Amino acid sequence: MKRQAFSLLSRLNPWQQLLLSAVLVTLAAPAAAQLRAPGTRTQGIFTQQGSQSASQGSTVAPSQPMMGVPQPSSQPRSQLVDEVVAVVNNSVITRRELLDRADEIESQLRAAKREVPPRPDLLGEVLERLVMERVQTQAAQEAGIKVTDQEVDRAIESVAQQNKMSATELRSRVEASGMSWTKYRDELRKQVQVIRLREREVDSKVQVYDGEIDNYLAARNGGQAAASGPTEFNVAQILVRVPEDASDAQKAQLKTKAEGLLKQVQGGADFAELAKANSEAPEASQGGSLGFREIGRLPAVFANAVVDLQPGAVVPEVLESANGFHVVKLVSKRTAAAQPAASDRIAQTQVRHILIRTGPNMPEAEAKRQMATIRDRITHGVDFADAARRYSQDGSASQGGELGWVSPGELVPEFEQAMNRLRPGEISDPVVTQFGVHLIQVENRRETEVSPEKQRDFARAEVREQKLRAAYDDWVRQLRSAAYVEYRINRQR
């Protein structure tokens, strides 16, 4: 199973997706990630299938930080008078930050020959994204999460690899864009901090049970694809947030406010406009819409209230949650496209490698230099297996570096991506992962039957990923709802 970065992207239109991802590329997986697939436990660089409890723990690689190569700014703003456009808890977002980010997104849209949205819409989306980033970064910092310089170095190396350049070339591009190298590293460090927080607060709490795997396989492998997919609900909300330390009198006052909004909706007022003007939820600028979701991906308090409603109906009473009071509407619902039956064959790669581990006594640059020398010797006649036995620091060294036949999704992304670019017999350039520096050789490729055990492994990974996406959405929403955010400009202008 490929490892997808779960996010809110599935709810956004194409230009909003580019707003969040732009020229983003995947970085090195956190050190806790395994070389092998979800649901396995490590034995050196090799792994074996673990028990259910192992697969429910922290062995699944979390979604990874994203960072792109900054583009040169056509209009430096060093002489602009800056001002605060939003306050997020105890920090601020400035107009310069907002305009710089919006310009970058607009530049990427134009470069991709994509339609550029109206400037007010773009600025509103960018500002909300900056708020969401700031809220998550603050939560990570308050949790005391630290990211080492070595982790940042590893992430930078991966960015460079993904953009087919060296770390030195990446630095030149960054500085040419007008961003200092220190700033770039700081931004990357913040992203890794957020990933660490999510590992602790979201990833580690998601479990997958055998019954869920059975249901998934029954739906996917029932002989034929289902005639139709699951029902999806497009729910919108207006949130009246209640502070954690609110008194009973304050709660009563805020509930009265929510009930007043409900009466306006029941009286024919436009729900989306009321949400834009009154909701304190992150999706307020989209009229309160959460986008289409299966019932299991909705907050439980919403799911129970809307499951039997007709499209266009409003829940007849104000709902209460830990975040406050909600006015909820079922905007529409639809039947999702059917999932195709799972293939009973997969492509596998026979691969071997040489590993030099990096650490305090082996800097990454030196490991790459040594690996380049080893590669040169192999290309001039030294046997790969002999070189692996002599130089590799992996448990596979005694077997000539053999990892055997591997399936898609079984290896960390940097390794698998480099492997997939090779033809049988070819040898990679040095490849950096969290384990160190690798030299990879593809020996052969084949298609093979998927065993029942492997199907369950894949199903477990897919079910877990679906649950992670839902849990992540809810986690981000709770962080945003609990934050103090004051807009100093109208997000709709």
UniProtKB/Swiss-Prot annotation:
Record-given protein name: Chaperone SurA
Gene3D superfamilies: 3.10.50.40, Porin chaperone SurA, peptide-binding domain
GO biological process, any: Gram-negative-bacterium-type cell outer membrane assembly
UniProt organism field: Cupriavidus metallidurans (strain ATCC 43123 / DSM 2839 / NBRC 102507 / CH34)
Primary site of residence: periplasm
Keywords: Chaperone, Isomerase, Periplasm, Repeat, Rotamase, Signal
GO molecular function: peptide binding; peptidyl-prolyl cis-trans isomerase activity; unfolded protein binding
UniProt comment concerning the protein's domains: The PPIase activity resides only in the second parvulin domain. The N-terminal region and the C-terminal tail are necessary and sufficient for the chaperone activity of SurA. The PPIase activity is dispensable for SurA to function as a chaperone. The N-terminal region and the C-terminal tail are also required for porin recognition.
Enzyme class of the recorded protein, top EC level: isomerase
InterPro entries documented for this protein: OMP_Chaperone_SurA (IPR050280), PPIase_dom_sf (IPR046357), PPIase_PpiC (IPR000297), PPIase_PpiC_CS (IPR023058), PPIase_SurA (IPR023034), SurA_N (IPR015391), Trigger_fact/SurA_dom_sf (IPR027304)
Function: Chaperone involved in the correct folding and assembly of outer membrane proteins. Recognizes specific patterns of aromatic residues and the orientation of their side chains, which are found more frequently in integral outer membrane proteins. May act in both early periplasmic and late outer membrane-associated steps of protein maturation.
Catalytic activity: [protein]-peptidylproline (omega=180) = [protein]-peptidylproline (omega=0)
Biased composition annotated in UniProt, kind: Low complexity: 48-58
Pfam family, one: Rotamase
Recorded name of the encoding gene: surA
Localization annotation: Periplasm
Limits of the PpiC domain: 230-332, 346-444
N-terminal signal peptide: 1-33
CC per GO annotation: outer membrane-bounded periplasmic space
